[in-house]
UniProtKB/Swiss-Prot annotation:
Organism: Mycolicibacterium vanbaalenii (strain DSM 7251 / JCM 13017 / BCRC 16820 / KCTC 9966 / NRRL B-24157 / PYR-1) (Mycobacterium vanbaalenii)
Name the UniProt record assigns to this protein: Large ribosomal subunit protein uL22
MF-aspect GO terms: rRNA binding; structural constituent of ribosome
Source species taxonomy: Bacteria, Bacillati, Actinomycetota, Actinomycetes, Mycobacteriales
Residue ranges of the region described as Disordered: 109-155
Summary of the function given for this chain in its UniProt record: This protein binds specifically to 23S rRNA; its binding is stimulated by other ribosomal proteins, e.g. L4, L17, and L20. It is important during the early stages of 50S assembly. It makes multiple contacts with different domains of the 23S rRNA in the assembled 50S subunit and ribosome. The globular domain of the protein is located near the polypeptide exit tunnel on the outside of the subunit, while an extended beta-hairpin is found that lines the wall of the exit tunnel in the center of the 70S ribosome.
GO CC terms in record: cytosolic large ribosomal subunit
Entry keywords, A to Z: Ribonucleoprotein, Ribosomal protein, RNA-binding, rRNA-binding
Amino acid sequence: MTTAIEYPSAMAKARFVRISATKARRVIDLVRGKSVEEALDILRWAPQSASEPVAKVIASAAANAQNNEGLDPTSLVVATIHADEGPTAKRIRPRAQGRAYRIRKRTSHITVIVESRPPKKAGKQGASASAARARRAQASKAATKKATDSKEGSE
């Protein structure tokens, strides 16, 4: 049984954004779980047109966290982000021989929740893994040297 840790958070929503939800989700998947600074850097250079409205919502959520909740902007992480479908505006495009095609102008609702998480301690776990790797390498070198020495001595 695991207990979920509650971190202080802030939310921002952009509703009726004139981009389809599927196009927004392509961009959203790039930044989910990243820090706010890293997410904004990724979106700044992403070629997709949906990156601009998604970046605006993330920046708004970060501003809400800083101004309303008093959270440190450097420790913010994009915890939850999703795009739901909004209403579709339907238009008619006249075509040849009296026909008409329907144009669907899709909208989406983008929701972002940022959390203030403490920085991860990279010292202990990474150091022990590299130390164990070094010990294994040293042991295998010693074993190889011992084996070559014993072969030379028997000849």
